[in-house]
Amino acid sequence: MGELTTSIVAAEEGGGTSNFLIPNGTFFVVLLIFLIVLGVIAKWVVPPVSKVLAEREAMLAKTAADNRKSAEQVAAAQADYDKTMADARGEASSIRDEARVAGRQVVDEKRAVASGEVAETVKSADQQLSQQGSAAQSELQSSVDGLSATLASRILGVDVNSGGSR
């Protein structure tokens, strides 16, 4: 209880007439300074900052629009590229097929020419062998009489040429 009394006494000694609910002159001075600073900030600081923020927002909107436009252009270019590549692949495929057909025709033509040449060569060789066989046959038939007479003479020991002419 002694402490409570000393704090009340100390409060009375410090000028007991001041009430914290009633503002004194410093409050109004501080309030006036605050309002002046607030007015200065509102007049000279906020408009340039607002202008910069508005410009930045406009720049961001323009950048976003440019990005969308660029994305559309890229998509269009990609679609055009894909279409061109598909056309080129189709054309290359048709050219390749035409080349295969032409190659097969050339091979077939060369094969036909080669078959004709082989047939001619075989026919020529057959004729040549037939002629050689006929020549050998006539030669052998002409020499058969002489050889048979010689062989008969050797086997019999008698000259057959003179007896065979009768």
Curated annotation (Swiss-Prot):
Region ranges (Disordered): 124-143
GO cellular component: plasma membrane; proton-transporting ATP synthase complex
TM spans (from-to): 27-47
Membrane topology: Single-pass membrane protein
UniProt subcellular location: Cell membrane
Assembly with partners or alone: F-type ATPases have 2 components, F(1) - the catalytic core - and F(0) - the membrane proton channel. F(1) has five subunits: alpha(3), beta(3), gamma(1), delta(1), epsilon(1). F(0) has three main subunits: a(1), b(2) and c(10-14). The alpha and beta chains form an alternating ring which encloses part of the gamma chain. F(1) is attached to F(0) by a central stalk formed by the gamma and epsilon chains, while a peripheral stalk is formed by the delta and b chains.
HAMAP family linked to this entry: ATP_synth_b_bprime
Family in the record: Belongs to the ATPase B chain family.
Protein name: ATP synthase subunit b
Source organism per UniProt: Mycolicibacterium vanbaalenii (strain DSM 7251 / JCM 13017 / BCRC 16820 / KCTC 9966 / NRRL B-24157 / PYR-1)
